[in-house]
Amino acid sequence: MLTKGVRALAWSPRRYITLDAEAAKPVVAKRRRMTEFTDKLNKGPSFEDFLTGKAAQMTLDPLEEARQNAEESKKLPAWLKVPIPKGKNFHKLKEDVRDLKLSTVCEEAKCPNIGECWGGNKGSATATIMLLGDTCTRGCRFCSVKTNRTPAKPDPKEPENTAEAISRWGLGYVVLTMVDRDDLPDGGAHHLAETVQRIKQKAPHILVETLAGDFRGNLEMVDVMARSGLDVYAHNVETVEALTPHVRDRRATYQQSLSVLKRAKQTVPTLVTKTSIMLGMGETDEQVLQTMKDLRAVDCDVVTFGQYMRPTRRHMKVVEYVKPEKFDYWKEKALELGFLYCASGPLVRSSYKAGEAYIENVLRNRRQA
């Protein structure tokens, strides 16, 4: 009996362990299938593709996707095709950005002008530094910047590293931008303001433009930025009011953007205020004209117009490739309405250097007056 009992005790654990392992297999397999399904879903067609009936035509094959992207690029109008970035200055600036662990909107947003801006000589090369990391808390449908609800904490060395990089490049005008940081109490305003101040300490002659977020409508943070010592306060409305809910993250509203531009000018009247509008998203001429009037009503000084370019097939589609002649038309209208300056063209972006050269002259003349 004792031997039998011992055998039973020795056998029972093995039996239960075997049963537990077998029972776990379906669970592990199910989790694996769910993970694979989630990955496929993330890489698959967008909701817009289902609405337009094109989801069935899509594939998850990376090679096929690359082929389709190549075919799509062939359809671009000639005026939207640019040469591949290259040159000594381009690679030197790129190395500096890497060495100092900085992010640039030029790369993150896949700007088509990166070769022209980074490839210029020492006096004209321009890079738009993106502060507060490379991950945004918002998900606008036109933007290719990475998104996450809880990005990494801001790098406390970033303001100093940014100022050091800019002093290396010997620029006379620099653009700072930021990802939206709704996870931070101040939206990142003090971090951005500190960067401006560090730059001014190292090189007082440099003119600084900041392309800031809306800080979720917290106008006190707009005051912090406006008083930081910057020269140009830029904040983009991006599109017309009617398309804003479709184009931008739900936390970004048209009226909120107007209030940011208005408050910046009220806080420091000598600031140049600036905004940018993308065309080709389905807007009408009447809507664009009204947007320009709304901007002038809040005393916005500078406006730029550029063609919306779809970063990837997961972003919203281009409704229209606007012809260069139309961009010329909007430039004329902007000047008629009283804007200080307007850069308008298919490849123009909010920090495009052509506009900076003009604004730089205006600001330096104001300093001398």
Curated annotation (Swiss-Prot):
This protein's pathway: Protein modification; protein lipoylation via endogenous pathway; protein N(6)-(lipoyl)lysine from octanoyl-[acyl-carrier-protein]: step 2/2
Taxonomy, superkingdom: Eukaryota
Transit peptide: 1-32
InterPro entries to which the protein is assigned, alphabetical: Aldolase_TIM, Elp3/MiaA/NifB-like_rSAM, LIAS_N, Lipoyl_synth, rSAM
Record EC number: 2.8.1.8
Pfam families: LIAS_N (PF16881), Radical_SAM (PF04055)
GO molecular function, one term: lipoate synthase activity
Domain Radical SAM core: 121-340
Manner of cofactor binding, per the entry note: Binds 2 [4Fe-4S] clusters per subunit. One cluster is coordinated with 3 cysteines and an exchangeable S-adenosyl-L-methionine.
SMART domains (UniProt xref): Elp3
GO cellular component: mitochondrion
Chief subcellular location: mitochondrion
Subcellular location: Mitochondrion
Residues involved in [4Fe-4S] cluster 1 binding: 106, 111, 117, 351
Catalytic reaction list: [[Fe-S] cluster scaffold protein carrying a second [4Fe-4S](2+) cluster] + N(6)-octanoyl-L-lysyl-[protein] + 2 oxidized [2Fe-2S]-[ferredoxin] + 2 S-adenosyl-L-methionine + 4 H(+) = [[Fe-S] cluster scaffold protein] + N(6)-[(R)-dihydrolipoyl]-L-lysyl-[protein] + 4 Fe(3+) + 2 hydrogen sulfide + 2 5'-deoxyadenosine + 2 L-methionine + 2 reduced [2Fe-2S]-[ferredoxin]
PROSITE patterns referenced in this protein's UniProt entry, alphabetically: RADICAL_SAM (PS51918)
Keywords carried by this UniProt record: 4Fe-4S, Iron, Iron-sulfur, Metal-binding, Mitochondrion, S-adenosyl-L-methionine, Transferase, Transit peptide
Binding locations of [4Fe-4S] cluster 2: 136, 140, 143
Necessary cofactors: [4Fe-4S] cluster
GO BP of this protein: lipoate biosynthetic process
NCBIfam families xref list: lipA, PRK05481.1, PRK12928.1
Family: Belongs to the radical SAM superfamily. Lipoyl synthase family.
PANTHER family reported for this sequence: LIPOYL SYNTHASE (PTHR10949), LIPOYL SYNTHASE, MITOCHONDRIAL (PTHR10949:SF0)
Record's protein name: Lipoyl synthase, mitochondrial
